[in-house]
Amino acid sequence: MALTIGVLGGGAWGSTLAGLLSQGGHRVQIWRREHGPQALQALAASEVLVGATALVGVSGMAQQIKGWSARPIVSCSKGLDPSSGQTASALWKAACPLWPVVVLSGPNLASELQQGLPAASVLAGHDEGLLSTLQQQLSTEQFRLYRNNDPLGTELAGALKNVMAVAAGICDGLQLGANARASLLTRALAEMATVLHGLGGRQDTLYGLAGIGDLLATATSPLSRNYRFGLCMADGLDRQQALEKVGATVEGVPTCEAIASLGRQKQWSLPITESVALLLQGALSPAQALQQLMQRELRCE
């Protein structure tokens, strides 16, 4: 059944999703920031909204539409709000408590999807009926959707892998080799599990598309902004220079700071996140960060 869908956010991911949904036969309208708040009203009649703004814009966007009638919103923003540590779906729910919110996350590099290459992703939420309906309505031959009932774990995995992709970019930029990259990503998965467990997500979510799937895509491909940012840091650029060279939102940066701060409060062992945070602050060089990781106390895996 064709739906009227409003896509909030016209960046790479929002534009890609709008294209996929249009190809699936839906009537799609997209709102970009440059359109201004008045143009947003054109999406008020949408049956489903897709939230694809950068995470920093979610709270403001939610405030603008909270007076609309309730309808499903598919939250696609990956990261944690640096001021509150909340996920995108939590920000949507805070402003629009009566709206059903589901999470879309997975190994979805926008440029590959724009080329017509296949991909899969996860729809996560607690309303099985809604999930099943949206799964059937939004899946296409190119873009296959699975579903799970762990939206928090799905969302956290999508946020955390951005931090690990920065670390992987640094590792590859230093030309440390395949062994080092494999070791880093394996320990990254364990670190992500620590955070998921501590915040109430399910650790088994990490072994699906939203976890290891997204991690492998984002932490190994130069198409990933977070990975490219890490490469730039390894080349000796500072934080601002690296951001300017990437030229697009790098969600791993504010997410790293939020997770590192939370980890210190909770006394979690998050050595990769902590090392990346110190790099971002300019307190460590890439080589010093590597040395710090390699000199940690020996223990059981």
From Swiss-Prot:
Any one GO BP annotation for this protein: carbohydrate metabolic process
Binding site for sn-glycerol 3-phosphate: K78, G106, K161, D214, S224, R225, N226
Molecular-function annotations in GO: glycerol-3-phosphate dehydrogenase [NAD(P)+] activity; NAD binding
Record EC number: 1.1.1.94
Disulphide bridges, residue numbers: none
Localization in the cell: Cytoplasm
Alphabetical list of Pfam families matching this protein: NAD_Gly3P_dh_C, NAD_Gly3P_dh_N
Highest taxon above the source species: Bacteria
PROSITE patterns for the chain: NAD_G3PDH (PS00957)
Active site residues according to the UniProt entry: K161
Coiled-coil residue windows: none
Cellular-component GO terms for this entry: cytosol
Main location: cytoplasm
Binding site for NADPH: W13, R33, K78, A110, R225, E251
Catalytic activity: sn-glycerol 3-phosphate + NAD(+) = dihydroxyacetone phosphate + NADH + H(+); sn-glycerol 3-phosphate + NADP(+) = dihydroxyacetone phosphate + NADPH + H(+)
Positions of transmembrane segments: none
Pathway noted in the entry: Membrane lipid metabolism; glycerophospholipid metabolism
Family of the protein in this entry: Belongs to the NAD-dependent glycerol-3-phosphate dehydrogenase family.
Task of the protein: Catalyzes the reduction of the glycolytic intermediate dihydroxyacetone phosphate (DHAP) to sn-glycerol 3-phosphate (G3P), the key precursor for phospholipid synthesis.
NCBIfam families assigned: PRK00094.1-2, PRK00094.1-4, PRK14619.1
Name of the protein in its database record: Glycerol-3-phosphate dehydrogenase [NAD(P)+]
Native source species: Synechococcus sp. (strain RCC307)
UniProt lineage: Bacteria, Bacillati, Cyanobacteriota, Cyanophyceae, Synechococcales
Name of the gene encoding the protein in the UniProt record: gpsA
